[in-house]
From Swiss-Prot, chains A, B:
Protein task: Formation of pseudouridine at positions 38, 39 and 40 in the anticodon stem and loop of transfer RNAs.
Keywords, ordered alphabetically: Isomerase, tRNA processing
Protein name: tRNA pseudouridine synthase A
UniProt gene name: truA
Residues at the catalytic site: D62
Family: Belongs to the tRNA pseudouridine synthase TruA family.
């Protein structure tokens, strides 16, 4: 997983979205429908290649998790890229299923690695608390919570979580991997028209289940079952707390991945590899 | 279909939403899954009744058409209403499938008829024209148009259609039914964040296929295949024009039904029955 394409290859950045409902997550798995698998198959077909060009992704999402601003890169032979560059998007649009869309395919700047060059990832988690349920048209990406939620209490709790911490209490354990993360943003807003609450969760990187555990803790504060200080107390204990409920995946959407200026991409990738052993496994 | 509940009955107004994707439309049909059928079954079950209480609806939507602001009424025996009033919403929420939600169930004012008392219906039709397709998370209620659309041209054409006209050119013919309608609003906006174009279409009532034919004509103007004056020329001809493409149903959502002040409900119902023979069949 280098930060330069091999000689004779072009590193292509892909910006894409998917509805995670009918996928077993991003990462390729035998006999499972995955986002990575669908895109690699489509690329192979539209470029009439016999080989599969592996994708590297910014955020490996779990089964049921969506993405609107996912980023990946793929290294294509120069000849393949030259032949297909112009029509690649339109052909992929025709070949890919409607629950995956690729918006942009363009040569990446030197030093670009979709995963290691990323500065941060921004997720949204959406929740409806209307007694009747969730708008049928958005039920695929909005969780229903059957108790009214107090926005201020949730934001009070959220403010105590931001910053660099050991998020062990909110992460699925993985041998040898650090759970130190910098949570840059955790903030709730309520849409005045629909009443839907959206959490914005942004960090340099996330460990597995981290976002959905943070949301689970927040909902217990929002519906009054726990005080606003509780999530931070759990955080301080640094051990997985069975009282923290990991919410369902369908409310979670990867909205954006940010990268530094081109000149800083390679340095960022090196930094991300060294400072912390980023998790090899899933992310949310 | 009177404007008063029979003695011993309470007329209950229901405000509801549904995702039309997996329904054969609103109106009950044997061996077909319909919105009316699902709700009447749920009502029968939660009230433990042996009889079915028939629903009267404001806008009978076709297969695949959604609703966010649909209104219906049902006449329930006073004893049934008294027993179930308090828990009806929560029980219906538990019994109904997630693609139908009832937000409110409350006694209707005297003279209320969900269909005939309505002043107007407001629909939205949503279209995406990004080359890559439509956001996978909203593809269920947004149509993809594979050519870029000119908002100004579409609004120029739309302005020529507003007012009271014979919309025969845009309606599925139905013997004995008038196609005179008052199109109160036809206006396009583009969401700056998503790029999705939304048409707001509001009229006292619609004849069958009218909205989707109006949208089909507008899209031909938007992508440059037809001039802005064309839809109005078709309108003036008063005969169904094969050049008018009826767009697919999934972009269409009934957003709101408006009613007059309580004191005017009965008069409005009488007016709606007399002035025009409102269509017995489908609406959009």
């Amino acid at each position: 997983m280098s930060d330069q394409a091999e000689p004779g290859f072009v590193r292509v950045r892909l910006d894409l979205s998917y509805d995670g409902k009918d996928f077993s997550g991003w990462a390729k798995q035998t006999s499972r429908r995955t986002v990575q698998g669908e895109i690699e198959d489509a690329l192979r077909t539209v470029t009439r290649s016999s080989v599969t060009y592996d994708l590297t992704v910014a955020g490996r999402t779990d089964a049921g998790v969506h993405a609107r601003g996912q980023v990946a890169h793929v290294d294509l032979p120069e000849a393949v890229w030259a032949e297909h560059e112009e029509k690649l998007l339109r052909r992929l649009a025709g070949r890919l299923p409607l629950d995956v869309r690729i918006w942009r395919a363009a040569p990446a700047p030197a030093g670009f690695n979709a995963r290691f060059s990323a500065l941060w990832r921004r997720y949204a988690y959406r929740v409806g608390d209307r007694p009747g349920g969730v708008d049928p048209l958005t039920r695929g990406h909005v969780l229903w919570h059957d108790r009214p939620l107090d926005l201020d209490a949730m934001n009070e709790a959220a403010a105590l979580m931001v910053g660099e911490h050991d998020f062990a209490a909110y992460c699925k354990k993985r041998e040898g991997a650090t759970t130190i993360r910098t949570l840059q943003k955790l903030r709730w807003v309520r849409d005045p028209a629909t009443g839907v609450l959206t959490a914005t969760v942004q960090a340099d990187a996330f460990c597995h289940n981290m976002v959905r555990a943070l949301i689970g803790a927040a909902l217990f504060v929002g519906d009054g079952r726990r005080p606003a200080a509780w999530p931070a107390e759990v955080l301080a204990a640094k051990v997985r707390d069975p009282g923290v409920h990991v919410v369902r995946p369908h409310g979670l959407t990867l909205e954006e991945v940010a990268y530094p200026a081109d000149a800083l991409l390679a340095a960022r990738a090196a930094e991300a590899r060294n400072v912390r052993t980023l998790p090899g496994a899933g992310c949310c």
